[in-house]
Each structure stands twice: as structure tokens, then as C-alpha cells.
Amino acid sequence: MASLSQLILEKKLDMKYSKKLKNQKIAKTRRQRGYHWEDTLVKRFNSLENWKAFRLGSPSVALPDVLVVNNILSVIFTIEAKSGTGTTLQVPYDQIERCLLWTNNFQVYKKREVILAFKFLSKKRIGSGIYENRKLHE
């Protein structure tokens, strides 16, 4: 039969790993939310005539989230996309700097802009002018 101290140790280990798994699940959900927002932006631009948008890769690479070009109008946008559940979202300075660097490197385009695209969790309408915060399921 297992000793009391061994049972306590096993319970602590179970709690530690279940908390770690829960945190991993939350992190995965947040990443998916961000990727979905980037994908939505790309689809919206690609649905417009003469516009081409591309997701540029993982966050570990020094690239903007989305690159958008219109060769007819000579326009390029670099987009840093942020999605969240709170009322504020922060964009790290280095991500803005990275977008500016990319935008300024394409001098053949007459109009070069950096766009910060934010998506916030919407509120649920429950009546005339009455809204309720949505419950976050992570």
C-alpha cells in the first residue's frame, strides 16, 4: 500500500501536469485566434480586385503578419494583426519597427503604409441598447 507522502506527491504531480496542459490549451487557443484573424484579413484583401495579400509566417521569424500589395495602384501594406478578449491590446515596439523596415524596403511602391489591425471579442446583444460580455471558453 502506498504511503501518505507518496499519495500527496502523486496528487501534486497530477495537479502540476493538469495545470500545464490547461495552460498549453489556452496558449493554443490564443494562437489559433490570431491565425484566424490574419487569415480573415488575407481573404478580405484577396476578394478585392487587383489586391494580393499573403500571410508571411510564424512569429519567430522577423516578418510582418500580413503583406498586401496592389501593383496597379503602386501600394504596399504591412499588417501587424492582433486579436484579443480584453478591452486593450498591446503591440510590442519591435513588431512595429519590423513592419516599418519591411515597408520602407519596397521603395518601388509609391504608397507604403503600416497597418495595425485589431480584433476584439464582441459583446452579446440582449436587448435594446443592452449588451452583455461574452463568456470566454478557453
Q: What do these predicted ranges mean?
A:
Residues 60-63:
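Short acidic/glycine-enriched loop/turn segments that link adjacent beta-strands
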Residues 2-9, 28-33, 113-138:
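Domain-level recognition of nuclease-like catalytic cores that cleave nucleotide substrates
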Residues 55, 80, 116-118:
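Structural signal for conserved beta-strand scaffold positions within catalytic alpha/beta enzyme cores
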Residues 2-57:
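Acidic-basic catalytic patches of nuclease active cores, encompassing PD-(D/E)XK
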Residues 87-118, 126:
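Short, charged, amphipathic alpha-helix that recurs within catalytic cores of restriction-modification
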Residues 58, 71-72:
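Short polar/acidic secondary-structure junctions
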Residues 45, 66-68, 74-85:
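Conserved catalytic cores of phosphodiester-cleaving nucleases, focusing on short active-site segments
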Residues 38, 80, 95:
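Acidic-residue sensor for enzyme active/binding pockets
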